[in-house]
Amino acid sequence: MRFSLLLATCVALTFSYTSNAEELIKLQRNHQLTLTEVVRLSILRSPKQAEIQAGKGLVNAKNIQANSFLPSAPAVSAGLQNDAVGSNRNLSQWEVGLDLPIWLPGQKTARTTLAQGAQIELDKTSANLSLDIAGQVRDAVWSLGMAINEAELQDARHKAAQDLLADVEKRWKAGELAKTDVMLAQNGTLLAKAALIKANAEVKHAEHRYWILTGLKELPNTFEEPLNSKEMIDDSHPWLAESAAKIEIANHHRSLSAIEQRENPQVMLNVRHERGAFDSLYNDSVGVAIRVPLDAKVRSAPMMANAEMAIAQAMSEHEQRQRLLESIS
């Protein structure tokens, strides 16, 4: 009964794994391909590259804002006033105005510093992405290597079981062994066959994971690489450098928020073309006015609170990363 069950299981595994194997990619060794090149290509096809490209756009936008002649967009106004509906004394007034915001003290410098910090943060994020992808590639290739070694081991065991079965059958036919010995040998052969099929399937699965990650149908010539001479993790580690850059950018945001607690002052220029009541002639004039918004908690309190929260979150994340790396180093 057990022999029949093992035989049925082995046949089922064979058809199942053969069917799956037909859908997987057969990888070949490329003696010109290096592990470094595999990592580079994997980084380029990472879905997180979309975030990096968006980050470049954000840095560019911050540079535009910092290098702008004005801190925000100007505004144009136009108006007409007459007494046609009212006293009807021939009053008429046309006015066109231009509102120009002006920089607050230190605002332009703070925005420039923020743009520079955003570029540094993006560079650190890109470096951390490279480290993360490199780790995934290493896991993929070494998992594949281990799966290949396991398949070779199971193949050797299966061949040994077949040789043993042939010898036992020969000795049974010669009357030296009982039929039960043959059945035990057949049972061992089927177990070895099932293990071999499973090991080969794991190779296919590992190849598929490698292909999904790298997009390559080729394996590097060797999985080995020189060992880094560093023995201790310091602040230059990409994971820590990224979180440290987030702290810096949060500090820059707080500095800018402290300056922008009130709105930008505005210089308002206007040209007026008017005719007074009962007058027949128009008078043209030019006016200048200054608008200075006042500081109020209704505006500044949420801005500073958000800035402080961002700093606290960045520092907390950095501390967590430090502790995690220290625990595994």
In which residue ranges do the predicted regions lie?
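Bacterial Sec-pathway N-terminal export signals of envelope proteins
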Residues: N20-A75, I102, E176-K179, W211-S255, ...
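Hydrophobic faces of stable alpha-helices that mediate helix-helix packing
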Residues: Q32, K56, Q116-Q119, D123, ...
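Amphipathic alpha-helical coiled-coil segments and their boundaries
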Residues: V38, R45, I52, P101, ...
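Histidine kinase transmitter module recognition
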Residues: A66, L129, Q136, A174, ...
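Small/polar-residue-enriched beta-strand and adjacent coil segments characteristic
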Residues: S72-L129, K246-E248, H253, E260-Q322
